[in-house]
Structure formats: structure tokens, C-alpha cells
């Protein structure tokens, strides 16, 4: 264990994260850096793992131009000196395994740019986001969901969407917040004769300005649905009523949240320098 004194003068013991090594292999780093891994979300972000027999969370983020990246949160009083990540120079990926951390923990990345400026950023690959905590990322539990939509999935294989009529019920974020019982809501939609629902702003968006087109999290469903599992329950309930679900989200515009993708590592890493 290591004993660390934070910026508030409080001392806390941690299991040494640097004694456990890292989880990504050299081949994975090579594929990620080359853009050849089409399921990068399974490696980037925060994932519960067992490393060296110890359960914890693996963090990985691409920030090739950053001087330093640290994992910060309430667990270390948002002090970037406590959990700096290991940088792999060949790939530009920062990685850290934090022992004993659990799903549900809110976190961000503190990124030190060349020149010394510091920004605190949301994880680009987080699968859960909490807009109420300044768009903090949340470690999502890797627990398989018990889907009950086998009949709907089988029917979809033979469905001709070009010939079958469609009646789509568009659901606003305000409506989503009011859904407490997905099964009851799905039954109501089915009774009205709709074949599909369309979820506005399915991906996490900039709710500060209520701009549904400013995507703030490309891998995290909007927290208006509750947790990702709450959204899965809604989709599951709709499919059981033979209702399709259309997810409406903007892939082309990320907005300008200070904690977002713009100027992520002190350069135009994710956006064009022309904007």
C-alpha cells in the first residue's frame, strides 16, 4: 500500500496501482494507435478487470500530446497528483489500473497540456455520464443484461421494413424523465397503435443549454433515461410489445463543453483545426 496526502492535507492509504501493471497488450496498443480496432470502446474508457488476482478498474485514454493525464474524482478529492496514468509513447495511450475501485464511481481525467495549462475532461469512451456532476464519467458495471426480446429479434429477421407501415411516436427528453414503469409505458404505446418509438437525444448531450444536437458522450446514453440499464429495460419492454426503438443522436457535432472533446489534449485531437 501507499499513503498519500492530498491537497486538503488528508492522508489516505491506497493499494499501490503501479504494482499491478497494465492490462492492454502491445498488440492492442498497436491496433488502437493505427485505428484498426473497430471495437475500441471495449478497451478505452473504464472497465472492471482482475489484474494479478486483484479486482479493480482499468482506465485507458488516447491523449498523445498531453504531458500528463490523471484519474480524478471524489475518491482522491480531484487531486491530479495522486493517480497519474502511465503513458505509452508509441501509441499515445495513457493507462492505469486502480485496485479495489468499483462500478458506480464518478471520475474524470485531469490533463496537463504542453505549456502547463490543465483541463479536466470527461472520458470520451465512458458508458455512463452524470450531467449533474459536471458531466462526470461513471464506471459502468460489466454485467450482462437479461434480455427478454427473443421473439421480437426473431421476427425482425423476416421483417420487410420497405413494405410494412410504420407509425413512430417521438419521445422528448421531458417525456423520458417521466417514465417510471417501462412496461406500463410500452403497453400504452402499443395500445395507441404505434409500431416504433423514437428517442430524441439518445446519446448524452449538453443539457446545460438543452441543445439536443450537441453530443457530449458518444458511448453513454443520455442520463435522462437514468442508468444505461434503465434504458435497456425501456428497450426490452418495447420489444416485448412488438415496438421498435429508433435512437436519434448527432454523430457530427460535439459542442463546446469545457469538459468535452474539443482541445482534448491541448490540440485539435478530435476536431478539425479549421473550426
Residue ranges, per PLM feature:
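The feature marks proteins involved in alpha-glucan
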Residues: 1-58, 88-170
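Glycine-rich, histidine-containing beta strand-loop boundary motifs that form or position
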Residues: 4, 73, 82, 98, ...
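Short proline/glycine-enriched turn/loop motifs at strand-loop junctions of beta-rich domains
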Residues: 62-69, 78
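Short beta-strand elements bearing conserved aromatic residues within extracellular beta-rich modules
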Residues: 69-71, 107
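Surface-exposed loop/edge segments in extracytoplasmic proteins
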Residues: 77-84, 117-120
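Substrate-binding/active-site clefts of carbohydrate-active enzymes
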Residues: 130, 144-146, 150-275
